[in-house]
């Protein structure tokens, strides 16, 4: 019993270690995506809109040891402004030509070294027939927070 207790005590005291990062800096970049910036992918069974931007701030160091957090900003520059962390999922109801559509819109992002891609998807592929104009994304604002650790 003493051996088991001794082994548990040794494991508990030496098994965990903490690495403290003492130098951290953050940078916030505001991005406005215009309606004309969204590109329709038109891929079979995976249709969505996307907007790719250059992000030289996402270096290999940030990619491997830092963090990138993206927020969608609503009502920017107003007293009612608020942010929502991506992914951003909203349930929608829309009536077009007397027909009711229930669907979900999702805004998310991908990033790599030097770039960031915003994606806008509508559930159930409601624009599979090529008539996606009514479901195209509007202009959107985003805040990108890049955290670097040294």
Language-model features and meaning:
Residues 11-12:
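Repetitive helical segments and hydrophobic/amphipathic motifs
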